Amino acid sequence: MALSKFQLVALLITYTLLFSCQSKIVKRMQVGPSECVYRGRCRDSYECRSRCGPPEFSHETLGLCMFDYDDYEYFCCCTTNY
């Protein structure tokens, strides 16, 4: 079964997006506690976007909701090391 040019382009774009997302997830998992500036509790990383943004942080700052094994709670981690 031959694919059309449109299907090939769509497949290539999908593959590229999936690959880049997986790379970002791997980098997020490598963030250590010493690389974070903590900004309160959270339920998901979406909550941390506003807490880790301007004016206090640059646009390159990533807000992650990370589990703290000492307190058994999730906290916002603001980091530029990703």
Curated annotation (Swiss-Prot):
It is found in: Secreted. Its main location: secreted. It comes from the Eukaryota. Keywords: Antimicrobial, Disulfide bond, Fungicide, Plant defense, Secreted, Signal. InterPro entries: DEFL. Coiled coil: none annotated. This is Defensin-like protein 275.
